[in-house]
Amino acid sequence: MDLMSFILLWAGLMKVAEASIAQFSQLGASAPGNIIIGGLFPIHEAVVPVNYTGNNSISAPEHPDCIRFYTKGLNQALAMINAVEMANKSPMLSSLNITLGYRIYDTCSDVTTALRAVHDIMRPFSDCESPEDSSQPVQPIMAVIGTTSSEISIAVARDLNLQMIPQISYASTATILSDKSRFPAFMRTVPSDEYQTCAMAKLLKSNKWSWVGIIITDGDYGRSALEGFIQHTETEGICIAFKAILPDSLADQQKLNTDIENTLNIIENNPKVRVVISFAKSSQMQLLFKGLQSRNISNNMVWVASDNWSTAKHILNDGSITDIGKVLGFTFKSGNFTSFHQYLKNLQFESEDEMNNSFLKEFLKLNAGNASNTVLELMKSTNLDKIFSIEMAVTAVANAVAKLCAERQCQDSTALQPWELLRQLRSITFENGGEMYKFDANGDINLGYDLFLWEGDQSDEHADDIIAEYDPTKGGFHYIHNDLSEIKKVVSRCSNSCQPGQYKKTAEGQHTCCYECLTCVENHYSNITDADECSPCDSESMWSLANSTECHPKVFEYFDWNSGFAIVLLILAALGVLLLFFMSALFFWQRHSPVVKAAGGPLCHLILVSLLGSFISVVFFVGEPSDLTCRARQVIFGFSFTLCVSCILVKSLKILLAFEMNFELKELLCMLYKPYMIVSVGMGVQIIICTVWLTLYKPFKDKEVQTESILLECNEGFYVMFWLMLGYIALLALFCFTFAYIGRKLPQKYNEAKFITFSMVICLMAWIIFIPIHVTTSGKYVPAVEMVVILISNYGILSCHFLPKSYIILFKKEHNTKDAFMKNVYEYARKSAENIKGLTGTEPQFKQENSVYTISNLSFVPEEKHE
């Protein structure tokens, strides 16, 4: 290799080395100090893209060209400078005779550029640009304040983790940065997006906005925010109608414009979406709002702004907020910014050679060197929440440094290590603006959010009203302004609300927020708006009609005492009892009269007593049933009526025996006629039936649950026993009817058999009719059916057996004599004998026995023949 070639090669290597070291420094502001703090701020919004697609396009790395000066970024850098100067003046550091210095870099809102700045921060060799002593080593940076973008902070944090240099961000909110296993050196003075997305979901829920859109910037911040927002909206029952993703880089204007147009089309094609949440950049929202105004899309919308652009009112493009709708912005908590504004007013713009802030130089040039106009622009671009967060970050570092340097000499830059400062920061409690603050276990300071409502136009940068505060610890909003009627009028729903009494039915494959409203069926209800399903009523005790908002208690139904029908039947029963008492008294008074003796004598009183029991049994069929009444009513009636019919059976046999002219038949009847035995046997069989019934299959109170009521009724236990009891009574009545029918042609004045026949016909017919009615009838009036039949039977016997005799006793006294009665009997006997002679042609023959029934004995009790 000749000398010339060696010289050229050496020159090339030196040029590359120069490019790799000097040209990549984005240092724009610096100040000396015992402890140096780094700052990373977006002084510019983008870098000029370099095309590396062609083979010939690959060249040595070049210094990036940053474009689009960002005034708010400069403002943030100045806030850090002001905070450092204030800390140096505080007794906390001045008493230790130490100062903080700073080196502030421009990230140009670009990850690669930010990493180049971090490389410069961590460079262990001399700063080539040192004007004083190039051999003096550059002081290491103990902590870094920044950055704004979560995506840049994530990349920067990975590099700073290598030396455990604490990084305190004032605006990066991505949830992933709270993961200390991945980002142990990262801290921040703002809450995580986990809380912001949760607050947004609660805001949507409280205003019943369930059909919304979301716009994000592609990158770690946007993706993380989208993921967290989806998680919280699913919990709150909110659906995302569309997701629009804008490019992270602002340099490729063509791609950005295309994505903005696509987003505008999406918004236009979703007219039901009136609420849009945006985590995009302010410059992207500026283009989006400009497109909305040009397309004349409805301004009846609500835009929910993340902290990324919530205070950037300059994006209105000389328009009014009414042109795009309403903007609700989430901002971090802020404090007193008077000192910072005073700092801006006191800025001294010296000659360029004397100024140590190249960023300020550039901004001054952009304002044509007009210092007063420069200050005015800076004051208008102040983000109060970010200024407060930056001041808090610097204050935290100053307190941690003071704590460490109180125990050691920190004039030497090697006396303190970054990891020691990080450890102290994680545990420090510091004061700022009269309040005490501390980083939590995730390295975050969670102060919550202010919710702003944009007012006025872009010129009113600070005219917004705080309408609410969100406290993450309580998980709710505290509204400062209650008059939010205009916001609450905005409806953002896929489907109209389902009213109480309805429920939502979502078609398969659709969003849960898109549904149709169906009416709740019977015995189901919904008492809230947009119920997911109708709740069933307790079928045992509650009921509801279709489209009901509540369940109604089921009413207990039974044959009530207040029922008009029950009152009528009870009056009839009471009247029957009164008649019984009257007839009992009358028959007892006339117990020796021929009519009473002919009616059965003592048996009459026994029949009256049995009818009294039958009338009383009617009372047990009315009112709320119980186990006792269910068992008592049938048994009382069964015993009473069996006794009554048994006595009537005795009467039937006695009448047949008294007037029977056929000796052989009379002899048979004499053998069968044992009055007390007949009554005892008749009652005994019924007692056996009822005893078995009450022992094995006892009736009980039962309930039948119906649609709107609960029917309380008596369950007879075993209906075979019930019908057996009634069947036995019917059998006795049939015997009575048969015997009475045989002896129906008695003397005209004494036609007891006919009355028995009529009474038994009435009873049998009533109970025959009762059978189909009882079987087919249901409801609370079932007991009334049996009551009616019992009363008919009782009154039938009372009317046929006792009323005619009472009439004779009271009004036909001439017939109530022995002579009148004997005359009728002899007349009946004479006619019977003539009828027999006419039929046979011979005189009737009567066989005499020791014992005869004398017709003169009106009680039909056999008397002995005297010889």
From Swiss-Prot:
<dbReference type="InterPro" id="IPR028082">
    <property type="entry name" value="Peripla_BP_I"/>
</dbReference>
<comment type="subunit">
    <text>Homodimer; disulfide-linked.</text>
</comment>
<dbReference type="GO" id="GO:0016595">
    <property type="term" value="F:glutamate binding"/>
</dbReference>
<dbReference type="InterPro" id="IPR017978">
    <property type="entry name" value="GPCR_3_C"/>
</dbReference>
<dbReference type="InterPro" id="IPR038550">
    <property type="entry name" value="GPCR_3_9-Cys_sf"/>
</dbReference>
<keyword id="KW-1003">Cell membrane</keyword>
<feature type="glycosylation site" description="N-linked (GlcNAc...) asparagine">
    <location>
        <position position="308"/>
    </location>
</feature>
<feature type="transmembrane region" description="Helical">
    <location>
        <begin position="782"/>
        <end position="802"/>
    </location>
</feature>
<keyword id="KW-1133">Transmembrane helix</keyword>
<feature type="topological domain" description="Extracellular">
    <location>
        <begin position="20"/>
        <end position="566"/>
    </location>
</feature>
<feature type="topological domain" description="Extracellular">
    <location>
        <begin position="697"/>
        <end position="716"/>
    </location>
</feature>
<feature type="topological domain" description="Cytoplasmic">
    <location>
        <begin position="803"/>
        <end position="867"/>
    </location>
</feature>
<keyword id="KW-0716">Sensory transduction</keyword>
<feature type="transmembrane region" description="Helical">
    <location>
        <begin position="567"/>
        <end position="587"/>
    </location>
</feature>
<dbReference type="GO" id="GO:0005886">
    <property type="term" value="C:plasma membrane"/>
</dbReference>
<keyword id="KW-0325">Glycoprotein</keyword>
<keyword id="KW-0807">Transducer</keyword>
<dbReference type="GO" id="GO:0006874">
    <property type="term" value="P:intracellular calcium ion homeostasis"/>
</dbReference>
<feature type="glycosylation site" description="N-linked (GlcNAc...) asparagine">
    <location>
        <position position="356"/>
    </location>
</feature>
<keyword id="KW-0732">Signal</keyword>
<feature type="topological domain" description="Cytoplasmic">
    <location>
        <begin position="738"/>
        <end position="754"/>
    </location>
</feature>
<dbReference type="InterPro" id="IPR017979">
    <property type="entry name" value="GPCR_3_CS"/>
</dbReference>
<keyword id="KW-0552">Olfaction</keyword>
<dbReference type="InterPro" id="IPR000337">
    <property type="entry name" value="GPCR_3"/>
</dbReference>
<keyword id="KW-0297">G-protein coupled receptor</keyword>
<dbReference type="GO" id="GO:0004930">
    <property type="term" value="F:G protein-coupled receptor activity"/>
</dbReference>
<feature type="glycosylation site" description="N-linked (GlcNAc...) asparagine">
    <location>
        <position position="55"/>
    </location>
</feature>
<feature type="topological domain" description="Cytoplasmic">
    <location>
        <begin position="588"/>
        <end position="602"/>
    </location>
</feature>
<comment type="function">
    <text>Olfactory receptor that is activated by amino acids that act as potent odorants in fish. Displays preference for acidic amino acids such as Glu over basic amino acids.</text>
</comment>
<keyword id="KW-0812">Transmembrane</keyword>
<feature type="transmembrane region" description="Helical">
    <location>
        <begin position="755"/>
        <end position="775"/>
    </location>
</feature>
<feature type="transmembrane region" description="Helical">
    <location>
        <begin position="717"/>
        <end position="737"/>
    </location>
</feature>
<comment type="similarity">
    <text>Belongs to the G-protein coupled receptor 3 family.</text>
</comment>
<feature type="transmembrane region" description="Helical">
    <location>
        <begin position="603"/>
        <end position="623"/>
    </location>
</feature>
<dbReference type="InterPro" id="IPR000068">
    <property type="entry name" value="GPCR_3_Ca_sens_rcpt-rel"/>
</dbReference>
<feature type="transmembrane region" description="Helical">
    <location>
        <begin position="635"/>
        <end position="655"/>
    </location>
</feature>
<feature type="glycosylation site" description="N-linked (GlcNAc...) asparagine">
    <location>
        <position position="527"/>
    </location>
</feature>
<dbReference type="Pfam" id="PF00003">
    <property type="entry name" value="7tm_3"/>
</dbReference>
<feature type="site" description="Critical determinant of selectivity of acidic versus basic amino acid ligands">
    <location>
        <position position="386"/>
    </location>
</feature>
<keyword id="KW-1015">Disulfide bond</keyword>
<feature type="glycosylation site" description="N-linked (GlcNAc...) asparagine">
    <location>
        <position position="97"/>
    </location>
</feature>
<feature type="topological domain" description="Cytoplasmic">
    <location>
        <begin position="656"/>
        <end position="675"/>
    </location>
</feature>
